[in-house]
Amino acid sequence: MYIEKAAENLLEQTPADIDVAVPRAKTTFKVMQFNMQFGQGWDDRDPDHAPVNLDLTIAEIRAHNADIVLLQEVEQVRARGGQPWTPPNYTRLRAALSAYHGYFAYRAADARELPFGIGLAILSKTPLRGRMRRGLPSPPIEFEFNGVKTTPTDRLLIGASTLLCGRELRIYNTHLLAFFMLKAQYDEPAGQREIILEELCTTQGATLLGGDFNVSKHLSLVSQFDAAGYQTVQENEVTWRRRPYVLDHIFYNGQLRALRHAVQPTRASDHHILTAEFEFID
């Protein structure tokens, strides 16, 4: 009898009488920028021979719980620049991070590739569409590696769009040529940067660009992108263990506001992790 009476009272209540917790709409989103160095960790004593530990990479991505994850050097270059049709590291990342949608791309296959990292990925908790890729030619600057003269391979820009907080967001990811590693008379890959800026000019809505820009004198990079309407979330903290350079950036345009950011060292790579939280500007 008591149960029936309680049920009657509940049915007679209007919606205003019932205190129901309504989930608040998401108003901000988090971005993680990470050159994962194909899963090779960091060893202070012997960094060049540190073991590959993809489990540590996966743990870092999970720990930051970002809405958007931008990754560089996802795979390790194979002999003669070979590119497996099914990229093993990316495949494992997707299996372990099932909450994310993803887009992965290699740059153009090239037998001149050096035995480092290759491949870009965008991971997003919301579906991706409008995917693109654009090659970034490298100048034919001759340099020597392990006693062999060679020239650098081209680089890559990828992009995709998604809906976050009910708004459309355009996302780009890149990894530029490290001129400073070539000991060339030119210090920065200005030509590659200009192609990226050309691509950014085609977007009209909220846009962000992350990546490893490999610019040792980063203030020139920051100034160049600022003149085009893109700010970096930070330009003061070093993001690379091997040299005191600010190589990694997240740039954003005037339709986004950066609320906070962090540079966090990790044993999962020779690069630090850069995160930033954003909101859309009405």
Where are these regions (language model features)?
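Beta-strand-turn-beta hairpins that frame and shape the catalytic cleft
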Residues: V20-M32, F116-L120, S124-R129, N146, ...
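Surface-exposed cleft-lining segments at the edges of enzyme active sites
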Residues: Q40-D48, Q76-R78, L136-T150, L176-D187
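Short, electropositive alpha-helical surface patch
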Residues: Q83-H101, A121-S124, V222-Q234
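N-terminal, active-site-proximal structural segment of metallo-dependent hydrolase catalytic domains
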Residues: M1-A96, F104-L114, D187-I195, D282
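Active-site beta-strand/loop signature of hydrolases that rely on acidic residues for catalysis
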Residues: F29-M36, T57-Q83, L123, A160, ...
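Active-site environment of divalent metal-dependent phosphoester hydrolases
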Residues: G39-G41, Q76-R80, D110-R112, A178-L182, ...
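Metal-dependent phosphoester-hydrolase catalytic domains
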Residues: Y2-D19, E198-L208, F213-D282
